[in-house]
């Protein structure tokens, strides 16, 4: 069954494997999450657990939110997410979910919001090639052809300049290099989406080989 936890991306560093290989890793700090609700097929139509991450001040939450977390005997949470395909019987409302649910060598999917880049052209946004920079081409970083003459319009999905970044992206099949239970850290091989201190969702890989 699947497992999941919420955390924050701290940054990147590198560690050495036993054979001397240098492994770039992303450090994710996942302080204990709290199970706020168990959803079942009978009551909600599907099975899932709802977890909360990071306390926030009571004055920043309304009465329904305060009542919801009171059932778990915890403080209001800044982030609340659901994890499906989990064994609901293993969890109880108010239980803490810690990094120790994962082990070294586990394969995971990490979801986050990519860094916002603002308004960008087609070369940076879509990786298109630029035109010649000399010999009077007068065509350097422009989008290029908008399409054939016949339809008298530009087709949808045409790659054009525009807002880049700020998208929800999942990177699949990342390997956990180390689990530090004392400091609530996960060291994940490779990079994960988002800026430093960004919220990330770590869960068991859905397409693990």
Curated annotation (Swiss-Prot):
Instruction: Name the InterPro entries for this protein.
Output: Ribosomal_uL3 (IPR000597), Ribosomal_uL3_bac/org-type (IPR019927), Ribosomal_uL3_CS (IPR019926), Transl_B-barrel_sf (IPR009000)
Which PROSITE patterns does the entry link to?
Answer: RIBOSOMAL_L3
In its UniProt entry, the species of origin is given as Lysinibacillus sphaericus (strain C3-41)
Q: Describe the function of this protein.
A: One of the primary rRNA binding proteins, it binds directly near the 3'-end of the 23S rRNA, where it nucleates assembly of the 50S subunit.
According to UniProt, the name of this protein is: Large ribosomal subunit protein uL3
Q: Which family does it belong to?
A: Belongs to the universal ribosomal protein uL3 family.
What Gene Ontology terms for biological process does this UniProt record contain? Answer: translation
UniProt KW keywords: Ribonucleoprotein, Ribosomal protein, RNA-binding, rRNA-binding
